[in-house]
Amino acid sequence: MAASAVAVAFVVAVAAVLAAAASAAVTYDRKAVVVNGQRRILISGSIHYPRSTPEMWPDLIEKAKDGGLDVVQTYVFWNGHEPSPGQYYFEGRYDLVHFIKLVKQAGLYVNLRIGPYVCAEWNFGGFPVWLKYVPGISFRTDNEPFKAEMQKFTTKIVEMMKSEGLFEWQGGPIILSQIENEFGPLEWDQGEPAKAYASWAANMAVALNTSVPWIMCKEDDAPDPIINTCNGFYCDWFSPNKPHKPTMWTEAWTAWYTGFGIPVPHRPVEDLAYGVAKFIQKGGSFVNYYMYHGGTNFGRTAGGPFIATSYDYDAPIDEYGLLREPKWGHLKQLHKAIKLCEPALVAGDPIVTSLGNAQKSSVFRSSTGACAAFLENKDKVSYARVAFNGMHYDLPPWSISILPDCKTTVFNTARVGSQISQMKMEWAGGFAWQSYNEEINSFGEDPLTTVGLLEQINVTRDNTDYLWYTTYVDVAQDEQFLSNGENLKLTVMSAGHALHIFINGQLKGTVYGSVDDPKLTYTGNVKLWAGSNTISCLSIAVGLPNVGEHFETWNAGILGPVTLDGLNEGRRDLTWQKWTYQVGLKGESMSLHSLSGSSTVEWGEPVQKQPLTWYKAFFNAPDGDEPLALDMSSMGKGQIWINGQGIGRYWPGYKASGNCGTCDYRGEYDETKCQTNCGDSSQRWYHVPRSWLSPTGNLLVIFEEWGGDPTGISMVKRSIGSVCADVSEWQPSMKNWHTKDYEKAKVHLQCDNGQKITEIKFASFGTPQGSCGSYTEGGCHAHKSYDIFWKNCVGQERCGVSVVPEIFGGDPCPGTMKRAVVEAICG
């Protein structure tokens, strides 16, 4: 070959490589994120890898894909990966690379939210506590020590992703990355130092050359080329800060977190779907559900303070990895409908037309003839019939219908056709307990004694929830209270979060803060004797705060004053006398939660209702493959370990306050709107990953602070107990799209884990009333309803019945819109 030909061939080859690289690059324009040269409507869901086990990851990711997701979004948890300076950990639940590779294997993309501040109701917002003690540090502002550590960790993660070939241009799944997190409110408060920090963070991130777009959420002045994005229950109001950026929603909140002492939040899927459809209707092109699977705050990872161990979040995939229906199924249908509209959605902006006082249409068209319409009724009470394109459409209140061809309704946000699954927690075994009493006033070889009160985290460095504060009070023989029988009054003021007061070795009182206010004050009558008295206060942290500014200033523990009233002298201030400090429990120092540590002490017969007690039991793994949990309803407050691994904090003794009332999907949602568990424990059941168990000889260890009844603890299996469906004659269907006509609606029921339908508890075709678990017949009822469902469904794992009068022996009430409603038992 001639030299010139070789040169030409080389140039062509290089051009081909460059062209391939260019086509693989991820960019964006004003309409959407552009992947491989194509504008994309991207549906994403948050799954946080440390909140589930590696054994759960493949199934969670597959269920996310089956639910219609394109992207899995996760934070990167700095304190899990760098527990001490320069010492990195990327194994087990923190194997980030393995998690991302599993997402790639499933054919999904990744939005990697490096932060490295994450909030996330995670301990200390994801920051390692050692960061607080870097000299001269001030968090999340224009501070050189903080910026140096942040840049070092961010660079570490980016270089790791590059070395593993995980960015999209390398053939990996990462198409987006996030720097910082929800910084806008802090920037507003701090002013210029915060603005300088935000600009620095953006420039630092871009300089890492990831070749994928960077985003900042809740950061209105994110500098180019960073995309600012929205977080919230609704984001149809949001527009990016520059016209050349796409409209993105990084956190569509599927509900809210659970905290100890507050009701459990739920968000109706009708409202969630409505919020997402409103955002897409506005021109949004990226939606991420926060959370799609919430998981579990294992060990001491929960933040808050007072964040519960469960991070279920009422997500489409529940804490245990099971589908939450109808939320998962209804959103899956929404995603299908949106994807049918994609060619029109990415082509241009909507044309919005009023169809009534609270009704409108948003129509998207492409130059190739694609047309998609969203018909909205934002009235919170009334149904509406609207005229559009020469046809009439019935819209439930607070809903949107999606027409991928501007004619055929395939989905309405308020018409839920997916089944409703009611879960059961089935007893799977009890335990034979032994107990060991935690020693009070048991100091180590070299206890810390100093004048005055010390802040708790400065002493413990968050290596334990527990810190003992002990001081001594001398009482003279001539004190009047000794002879007149009166009590002294002890007052202890603490920054939080919980406190047990012991006088001469006896528990005298317990006090704790709340999600809204972690600070607390103990005031109680105490009996002292002549001579030396011991006052011991066990201060307990319940997760470090995860949101706010100036993390370096946050504190916990007894800061004072501590006073004693009723002495001859009046009030004695104990704040500035000598205090002795013991970090952690004696049982912790002996590793009683482990097999080796638990064998070093003598365990006795179990005691009940005794504070500061360790319990242990051995058990075999229950048969089957259903997810497992511990029912802790008989206990007060403490921590759980299985085979040495931390299940988390438990606190069923903290009852949820408030009045839960009824729930209606219509109208704006907030975290107080649809709640359960008022007057009950915020969390009763605690997830036990099956992968943590051996077939036999598993060690369960519990530390109980308050005093509970361990004989009431049981292992339970989580599975579907019953399934319900409520389907209208005119339920929109994806089949309508294929036939361009309105297909017959159909009821679908399905049990799980090999279960079959064993009984039809209720069935009615007509106008039934009530909700799943409490249905009743209405004024219109087809008498063959029960027989039809029994014949088609009993003995089957899944079944389907068409919602048409002839199936049920004729029309029981002509001219009336009818529904087929059924409840079936799985077993």
UniProtKB/Swiss-Prot annotation:
The active site is at E182 (proton donor), E251 (nucleophile). GO terms for molecular function: beta-galactosidase activity; carbohydrate binding. Residues 1-24 form the signal peptide. Its EC number is 3.2.1.23. CDD domains: Gal_Rha_Lectin_BGal. Residues 741-827 form the SUEL-type lectin domain. One of its GO terms (biological process) is galactose catabolic process. Gene3D superfamilies: 2.60.120.740, Galactose-binding domain-like, Glycosidases. It catalyses: Hydrolysis of terminal non-reducing beta-D-galactose residues in beta-D-galactosides. It comes from the Eukaryota. Glycans are attached at N209, N458. Belongs to the glycosyl hydrolase 35 family. This is Beta-galactosidase 2.
